[in-house]
Regions:
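Conserved alpha-helical substructure of the radical SAM core
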Residues: 1-83
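Extracellular/mature segments of secreted proteins
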Residues: 6, 25-31, 198, 214, ...
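Class I S-adenosyl-L-methionine
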Residues: 6-17, 93, 112, 172, ...
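Active-site pocket-lining/capping segments in soluble small-molecule metabolic enzymes
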Residues: 13-16, 76-81, 108-110, 187-191, ...
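Conserved beta-strand positions
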Residues: 50-52, 134, 197
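Conserved AdoMet/S-adenosylmethionine-binding subsite of the radical SAM
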Residues: 59-160
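A C-terminal junction/extension of Radical SAM enzymes
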Residues: 131, 140-213
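Flexible mid-to-C-terminal extensions adjoining Fe-S/redox cofactors in radical SAM and related proteins
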Residues: 210-321
Length: 321
């Protein structure tokens, strides 16, 4: 069931997830399409998330945006960043000298090499913000050696998270704390509980499909005049993902864009995505167990010990997962 409408305000709207957005030329969504998108959201009872470019907007757009409840996703280098509900850093260097708000949510989009090299710096952000989401921009390039490095990064973040917990704080770091708190899958769910309206006035499963180098006609799933027309819509639902629906890496993005890119099947996750999610899961388990040595901590939560990182490794015993 759809819950959110993501509206890209400009062709150069920031990425906030795994996909890369290389469009530099600004082309605003038509004002009529913006208003029609808002009417669509009202009719379907959807919450709107506006995704901003790095430039200012005309006053009439600002006024239209405020006609409905919404949240704003804005890049850190935008002149409107103080209005953001979610601030996006597209480079870790953009955090240097940035004035963090302890009550705000931040997304750090980062490649693996920068993450490995800057883990100590990034770890200091955990105590400065209400929530930090770390999003890898090159998941498909991870090797076995990279997985080992990522585990080391997670261990470092896990120690910092424990430190904050023990100081009486409530840190939120997506790759560590989400799995500790979750009791069921909490994925991206593009195509099932959210859909994207692009600047061309058409709908796409998520922004990644709009920004794909492939023909946009391939990925368009409707428009403002005709409504949504998602082919095989059930395939975007968790219930139709045979491996993911029995997995307990509940914090996994289950990114259908990466699935399609890596396995040519939106229901089948890649080895890289699975291993990264299970490394995060296991670190969450370690933090949970460590905290329980000192006090009661999420007593209702039970993250079982496992001996695999990719469910395909135990495919014969899927019923044991």
């Amino acid at each position: 069931m759809l819950q959110y409408l993501i509206i890209l305000l400009d062709d150069a709207s920031t990425s906030y997830c795994h996909y890369n957005q290389s469009q530099s030329q600004h082309q605003l969504i038509g004002l009529a399409d913006l208003k029609a998108g808002i009417r669509f959201a009202m009719k379907e009872n959807l919450m709107i998330q506006y995704v901003y470019p790095d430039c200012d907007l005309p006053q009439e757009y600002k006024e239209t945006i405020e006609t409905i409840d919404h949240s704003k996703i804005i890049p850190s280098n935008s002149p409107l960043v103080e209005e953001a509900d979610i601030v996006v850093f597209n480079d870790w260097k953009d955090t240097v000298g940035f004035s963090f708000d302890e009550s705000a949510t931040y997304v750090l989009r980062i490649c693996k090499e920068d993450l490995f090299a800057q883990k100590e710096v990034i770890g200091t952000f955990i105590s400065k913000v209400a929530r930090l989401n770390i999003v890898l921009t090159d998941v498909e390039t991870f090797t076995e050696n990279d997985f080992s490095k990522y585990k080391s990064v997670l261990d470092s973040f896990g120690k910092e998270t424990e430190k904050q917990y023990k100081a009486g704080m409530s840190p939120q770091l997506n790759v560590i704390t989400d799995r500790i708190a979750l009791s069921q899958m909490n994925n991206c769910n593009a195509g099932s509980n959210n859909i994207t309206l692009a600047p061309d006035g058409r709908f796409y499963i998520c922004p990644a499909f709009y920004y794909s180098a492939e023909d946009k006609e391939t990925f368009c799933v409707g428009d403002l005049q005709s409504g949504l027309a998602i082919k095989a819509a059930n395939l975007y639902k968790l219930a139709y993902a045979p491996l993911c629906r029995i997995c307990d890496a509940y914090q996994c993005k289950r990114c259908v864009w990466i699935n399609r890119k890596m396995t040519f099947d939106i229901t089948t996750p890649s080895h890289e995505q699975c291993v990264l999610a299970h490394l995060e899961r296991n670190t969450s388990r370690s933090v949970l167990e460590s905290m329980r040595k000192d006090k009661e901590f999420y007593p209702e939560q039970d993250i079982k010990e496992i001996n695999y990182l990719d469910p395909f490794e135990v495919k014969i015993d899927w019923h044991k997962i």
